[in-house]
Amino acid sequence: MKRIGLVFCALLLLLGMGARPAAAYPYYAQMAYDNPREATGKIVCANCHLNAMPTRAEVPQAVTPGQVFTIKVGIPYDLSKQQVLADGSKGGLNVGAVVVLPEGFRLATEAEMTEEQRQETAETYITPYSDAKPNILLVGPLPGEQHQEIVFPVVAPDPKEDPSVAFMKYRVYIGANRGRGQLNPDGSLSNNNVFRAPATGRLVNIATLDSDISDLPAELASLVPPEYELPGTRVLSFESESGIHNLVVPPGPELVVAVGDSVKEGDPVTNNPNVGGFGQVERDLVLQSPDRVKWLVAFLAAITITQVLLVLKKKQVELIQAAEILG
């Protein structure tokens, strides 16, 4: 399952997202982080997906050792929305999710799942975050229209086989995003972000790349990075007291300024094309001992039997007292 998932995701990235995609794919966290959950509790996907959107999660209250159970992650959003793709065109939103399980918990294999669980996960390719962290699960990119809910099949550990695991209450951390990120893994802006004026001054020129980088003057063409050599890329020139400042705006964001407009440093010169976002939730999960459950059932049964016997004894005493009175 892991190999298929990685191949599938790699193909999507190569075919659809361009040279530096800021996508709804948790796999980008693997490039820079050994652990996708920071010490503060924040899942690192939020570092690139700056807009907050809701995430829903269904986690069992308690599980027993060896039990195969499912965690359901809901990723709601307005299906009528379309996002800006890497080339500036519009398209549907993709989704991705990450589930940080307690250590010892892992992804269930197909052989361990029930038929119902196989059907629920048939079109999702879930992989561990790394060989060293099989308790952290990733999925995506997936078409958002068909995957507003993602099911993760999980196996609970057995403390008898793994001494590092105990019967206790644990926390499960879940994050999900829809749409492309606003930042690339290297921290640069993606074309799914707002671009701002680099200096206070006046916009004096807008040069647009129509088909080839040669469309631009040489002094401006050298400013355009290879990943932005796309039709629709614009180079904005601002005249300020310190000289000319240029800003490269890739295709996608729409300009909200025109030549001759005065701007202040940091003012937005494009709209915000982002329609997606990231959300994170936490849930409790108890690893329950079957022996404790058995003893609890036995204890409750004993209490019930004792109460019944007390009622019967009380009735017996009442009958004896009634007979003595009548006699």
From Swiss-Prot:
Main location: membrane
Residue ranges of the TM segments: 293-313
Cofactor annotation comment: Binds 1 heme group covalently.
BP GO annotations: photosynthesis
Keywords: Electron transport, Heme, Iron, Membrane, Metal-binding, Photosynthesis, Signal, Thylakoid, Transmembrane, Transmembrane helix, Transport
Record carries keyword Transport: yes
Pfam families on file: Apocytochr_F_C (PF01333), Apocytochr_F_N (PF16639)
Cofactors that this protein relies on: heme
Compartment annotation: Cellular thylakoid membrane
Xref: PANTHER family: CYTOCHROME F, PTHR33288
Subunit field text: The 4 large subunits of the cytochrome b6-f complex are cytochrome b6, subunit IV (17 kDa polypeptide, PetD), cytochrome f and the Rieske protein, while the 4 small subunits are PetG, PetL, PetM and PetN. The complex functions as a dimer.
Family according to the record: Belongs to the cytochrome f family.
Function field: Component of the cytochrome b6-f complex, which mediates electron transfer between photosystem II (PSII) and photosystem I (PSI), cyclic electron flow around PSI, and state transitions.
Name under which the protein is recorded: Cytochrome f
Origin species: Synechococcus sp. (strain JA-2-3B'a(2-13))
Lineage: Bacteria, Bacillati, Cyanobacteriota, Cyanophyceae, Synechococcales
Gene of this entry: petA
